[in-house]
């Protein structure tokens, strides 16, 4: 779930349902927890909805602001595709939300943790030494898509845990935890 500008909320469910709701129509209460307050979805119908194949991983990346197009962008994935979700900042101007394919790929065996950046992603699994690195681009204004690629880095050790892991796309550094240490890998030169 992600709050959006303009009194909107974005909801992405693991089953592949993605919705945007207008929260301005939802009543407010001063009771915490609300007393006899029906669930919010009884007051709100989605203003935009897309049903796609099952989402995989954490469902949505953090939002990325694209000033050139005045949109928010999110990265999400299924078992075989990385997608970008483009949402206009002002829902009254321009086209509505759009789902674009960023990269075709097949989830490697054992890859469970997905760390998404704007143009790259990392995947790894529990107890494996393989770190899968994906590089993709967003479509140009004319719709063309630059080539994407991936590589596998084999890390020392074989006891990497699911969480916590994180990466900084700008510096090219990935932080991973084994069962007894925290390690920072630098992929800036790749």
Model-derived features: positions:
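Extended alpha-helical scaffolding segments
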Residues: 1-8, 12-190
């Amino acid at each position: 779930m992600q709050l959006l500008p303009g009194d909107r909320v974005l909801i992405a469910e693991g089953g592949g349902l993605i919705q945007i709701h207008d929260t301005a129509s939802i009543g407010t209460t001063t009771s915490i927890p609300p007393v006899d307050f029906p669930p919010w979805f009884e007051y709100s119908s989605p203003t935009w909805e897309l049903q796609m194949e099952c989402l995989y991983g954490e469902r949505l990346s953090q939002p990325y602001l694209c000033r050139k197009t005045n949109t928010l962008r999110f990265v999400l994935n299924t078992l075989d595709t990385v997608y970008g979700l483009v949402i206009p900042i002002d829902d009254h101007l321009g086209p509505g939300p759009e789902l674009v394919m960023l990269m075709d790929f097949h989830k490697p065996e054992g890859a469970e943790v997905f760390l998404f950046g704007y143009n790259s992603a990392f995947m790894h699994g529990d107890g494996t030494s393989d770190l899968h690195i994906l590089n993709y681009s967003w479509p140009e204004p004319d719709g063309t898509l630059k080539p994407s690629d991936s590589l596998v880095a084999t890390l020392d050790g074989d006891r990497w845990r699911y969480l916590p892991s994180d990466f900084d796309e700008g510096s090219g550094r990935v932080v991973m935890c084994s069962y007894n240490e925290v390690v920072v890998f630098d992929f800036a030169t790749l």
